[in-house]
Amino acid sequence: MIIKFNFEYRGFYIEGMPLDQAENGHPEDGITYTSYVYFSKQEYNDLEDYIFDLCESYDSPEELKENTPKNIDKYIKKHKLKR
C-alpha cells in the first residue's frame, strides 16, 4: 500500500505524494515521490495552490524528506522571506 505523508518545516507545509510511474506508462521508473509545498498548513487546508518552484520528484521518501527542507531554505533566501 502506498501512503502519502506530510510534515512541516519553518512554517511551510509539505505533502509527499507517491506516484506509481507505471500509471504514466513508465513502469521502469517504479514509484516516485513528489513534494508539494505550501506557505502554511492553513493554506493547504484552504486549498490554496502549492509553491510550483518547490515541486520536485524524488526516488524515495527519505530523499524527499532530506532535500525539501534544503530547497525551502534556498527559496527563503532567494525571495528574502522572513521565516
What residue ranges belong to the model's regions?
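Hydrophobic beta-strand residues in large extracellular and virion-surface proteins
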Residues: 7, 14, 33-39, 60, ...
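Mixed-charge, Lys/Arg-enriched low-complexity segments
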Residues: 43-83
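Surface-exposed beta-strand edges and flanking loops
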Residues: 5, 16-18, 37-41, 76, ...
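Short aromatic-glycine-(Arg/Gly/Cys) micro-motifs in beta-strand/loop hairpins
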Residues: 27-51
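Negatively charged, low-complexity tracts enriched in Asp/Glu with abundant Ser/Thr
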Residues: 1-23
